[in-house]
From Swiss-Prot:
Source species of the chain: Synechococcus sp. (strain CC9902)
Family stated for the protein in its record: Belongs to the urease beta subunit family.
Keywords: Cytoplasm, Hydrolase
KW DNA-binding (keyword) present: no
Protein name, UniProt field: Urease subunit beta
CDD domains cross-referenced by the UniProt entry: Urease_beta
Length: 106
């Protein structure tokens, strides 16, 4: 057996599918501002920067369907479709821009 290395990651062989089986919502997003906007993987998308133009009701309780720790950058004038997935667990959103601060489904 090989010696253990602190912090080493040993993934299963093959490919791993992120967020497998999670429902996906695709929305169109435009940056109507004059500065770039970056949104992280676990940010409550409905509360993203006001310069981003999209259906915020459709984005309620959802986050970007991208690997953890990454982000998407929207340059001024950018238009693109993004995939969102629902928050799991207790489905509570606390902080961010303070628009919910409680249960998502209330």
């Amino acid at each position: 057996m090989a010696p253990l290395i602190p912090g080493e990651l040993i993934p299963e062989p093959g490919e791993l599918e992120l967020n497998a089986g999670r429902p996906v919502t695709t929305i169109s997003v435009a940056n109507g501002g004059d500065r770039p906007v970056q949104v992280g993987s676990h940010f409550h998308f409905a509360e993203a920067n006001a310069a981003l133009q999209f259906d915020r009701d459709a984005a309620r309780g959802q986050r970007l369907d991208i690997p953890a720790g990454t982000a998407i950058r929207f340059e001024p004038g950018d238009h693109r479709d993004v995939n969102l997935i629902p928050f799991a667990g207790h489905r509570r959103v606390i902080g961010f821009n303070g628009r919910i601060n409680g249960p998502i489904d209330a």
